[in-house]
């Protein structure tokens, strides 16, 4: 039971990050910068206690991974600014699952059995259905301005997905240990955060406030590393997708994002489809 609890913690931590970002304020640029500094602080503390070996490869790969994480996070927060948390997060999660899955299949040949192929295809279908259901628009949102924001938000999310994809796969391509990559990743995140935001004057009180989400993100990362050897990569991957419940429903219940009954139904059912897809992909990976 304790092992499963540890495996659920990343979902709880990561699912709450955007809620903290929005509540703490400051816009996407200050939020991005503050989050990266929070991750760096946490990673320095972990490094002091864990003392992982840092080779040139680990440092280089970790920094590149962190740079692309910053690209993913900054654009996800921009999309949230346009579309809201409860709409952005299910779509973002779905796009990330599709991207990482297809990359895993094409490059790493993850679906090696008939069962994994069937489960994988079913999962991708579930993701598409889930994303469509969570994207339902109300009549008010069909006006020109809202429609333009939605289209722009989707394009920005595609860029975000590329960032998150490279952040994940570059570590795997070079077979770098997660604990070893943690500090170089955080350095890359800060560098990426500065490069992406400095033109927008993000160094303010909101950036300092948003150090908190960065600490939360890094804590979630740490618990993922702890839980994977205990429950396996497949289970930890599946459980980590549950964060979508916290972020999406939190956007509605905590941040007060308004939804029609039709949209609420679509969001709930869509989340179920995306979570089911995450579980199936976890099984297909095992």
Curated annotation (Swiss-Prot):
Out of the domains of life, which is the source? Answer: Bacteria
The record's section on InterPro entries has: Sugar_transport
Transmembrane intervals = 4-22, 27-49, 53-72, 85-107, 111-133, 154-176, 181-198, 211-228, 233-255, 267-284
Single GO cellular component term? plasma membrane
Kindly indicate whether the keyword Transmembrane helix belongs to this entry: yes
Q: What is its main location?
A: membrane
Annotated membrane topology is: Multi-pass membrane protein
Q: Which UniProt keywords apply?
A: Cell membrane, Membrane, Sugar transport, Transmembrane, Transmembrane helix, Transport
- Signal sequence span per UniProt? none
Function of this protein?
Answer: Involved in the uptake of glucose.
Q: Which family does it belong to?
A: Belongs to the GRP transporter (TC 2.A.7.5) family.
**The name this protein goes by in its record:** Probable glucose uptake protein GlcU
Question: From which source organism is this entry?
Answer: Bacillus cereus (strain ATCC 14579 / DSM 31 / CCUG 7414 / JCM 2152 / NBRC 15305 / NCIMB 9373 / NCTC 2599 / NRRL B-3711)
**What gene name does this entry carry?**
glcU
């Amino acid at each position: 039971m304790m092992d499963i609890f540890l495996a659920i913690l990343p979902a709880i931590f990561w699912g709450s990050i955007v809620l903290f970002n929005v509540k703490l304020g400051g816009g996407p640029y200050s939020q991005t910068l503050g989050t990266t500094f929070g991750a760096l602080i946490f990673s320095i503390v972990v490094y002091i206690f864990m003392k992982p070996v840092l080779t040139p490869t680990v440092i280089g790969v970790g920094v590149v991974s962190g740079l692309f994480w910053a690209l993913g996070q900054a654009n996800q927060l921009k999309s949230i600014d346009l579309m809201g948390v409860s709409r952005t997060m299910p779509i973002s999660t779905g796009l990330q699952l599709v991207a990482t899955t297809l990359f895993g299949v094409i490059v790493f040949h993850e679906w090696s059995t008939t069962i994994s192929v069937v489960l994988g295809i079913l999962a991708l279908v579930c993701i598409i259905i889930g994303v469509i259901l969570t994207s339902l628009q109300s009549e008010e949102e069909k006006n020109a301005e809202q429609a333009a924001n939605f289209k722009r938000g989707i394009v920005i999310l595609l860029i975000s997905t590329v960032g998150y994809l490279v952040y994940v796969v570059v570590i795997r391509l070079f077979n770098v240990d997660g604990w070893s990559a943690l500090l170089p990743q955080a350095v890359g995140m800060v560098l990426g955060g500065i490069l992406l935001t400095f033109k927008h004057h993000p160094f303010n009180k909101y950036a300092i406030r948003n150090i908190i989400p960065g600490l939360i993100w890094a804590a979630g990362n740490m618990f993922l590393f702890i839980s994977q050897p205990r429950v396996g990569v497949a289970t930890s991957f599946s459980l980590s997708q549950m964060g979508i419940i916290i972020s999406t429903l939190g956007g509605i219940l905590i941040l007060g994002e308004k939804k029609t009954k039709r949209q609420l139904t679509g969001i709930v059912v869509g989340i179920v489809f995306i979570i089911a897809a995450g579980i199936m992909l976890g099984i297909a990976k095992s």
